[in-house]
Amino acid sequence: MKNLYTQLEQDNVPKTLTLLLQSIVGACTEIATRINHGALSDVLGSLPDHNVQGEVQKKLDVIANNILIESLKKNKQVRAVASEEVEDIILCNSFGKYLICFDPLDGSSNTDVNGSLGTIFSITSASAAQTEVSEEDFFSTGRSIIAAGYVLYGPSLMLALSTGSGTHIYTLDPSNNNFMLTHPNLNIPEDTNEFSFNLSNQFKWPENVQKYIVDLQLGTDGIRKKNFNMRWLGAMVGDMHRILCKGGIFGYPEEKNFKYGKLRLLYEANPIAFLVEQANGLASNGTTSILDTVPSSIHQRIPVFIGSKNEVLLIEKYALGK
């Protein structure tokens, strides 16, 4: 069984990018240790502050964010980073080759109940010109991503990663602290009978999305002619991990009070879309590919429908009223 770095070498990943991934993976391993200690080290619960998104911050949100930033600042290949938890970009090394976007702790509302958690990240190339980086340098589409992944803090510590040559899943071997390739070349089934939507928000969604949900709940007697199962873990990483492995569709539509959806384009939607499309799936905002969206803010939000190809294409038809 190959380890992470053997696979990266086989995929001809540049040494500089490998070293950057090593920094990210190392930081996530440290985050996993802090999560595992949980209540034993008083890292659960909320803080009195809100983050830039207006959301209540969990203690582990801040801990995970600080661990990642500290690790990335030490890496000379990093020009700048953008974090979901921080209002502005963070400048690192003026000669660095890479820009990194990350959500340090996806699903942090699950921290107090020992639920699914994850870290999501993507990497793009910085401008070759040695100029000061600004927020606008992060405004490239997801097609410019050169590597993306997530770490799932579950029963096993798992890394899903793509450097543009397919999507692979690695599992941490605690006996030697190496990530081993356990699920190579993922291939999401084109059809599915599983969906991951938070139906408690259904009344807030556009009518066409509501109709899609109603139709798939009618079972074998309805227009879809089959039964669907619902899965919802309260963490995008957890739901998407299942979809990468077994197929399905994840949806977080726009809502009445959130015209552009709630998930962030740079920190959540783009990295997951990159992984999914590298695994034969699709990722859409309801009408067009997420990866073709040009950002206008580092904290831009976007509606998300990601997963099995035929199901994503179908929901686009519903969005068009077909």
Curated annotation (Swiss-Prot):
Main EC class the enzyme belongs to: hydrolase
One annotated GO biological process: sucrose biosynthetic process
A GO cellular component entry from the record: cytosol
Binding residues for Mg(2+) 1: 84, 103, 105
Cofactor: Mg(2+)
Binding locations of Mg(2+) 2: 103, 106, 268
Textual note on the cofactor: Binds 2 magnesium ions per subunit.
Signal peptide limits: none
Keyword Cell membrane: no
Catalytic activity: beta-D-fructose 1,6-bisphosphate + H2O = beta-D-fructose 6-phosphate + phosphate
Subcellular location: Cytoplasm
Record PANTHER family: FRUCTOSE-1,6-BISPHOSPHATASE-RELATED (PTHR11556), SEDOHEPTULOSE-1,7-BISPHOSPHATASE, CHLOROPLASTIC (PTHR11556:SF35)
Stated family: Belongs to the FBPase class 1 family.
The protein's name in its UniProt record: Fructose-1,6-bisphosphatase class 1 3
Gene: fbp3
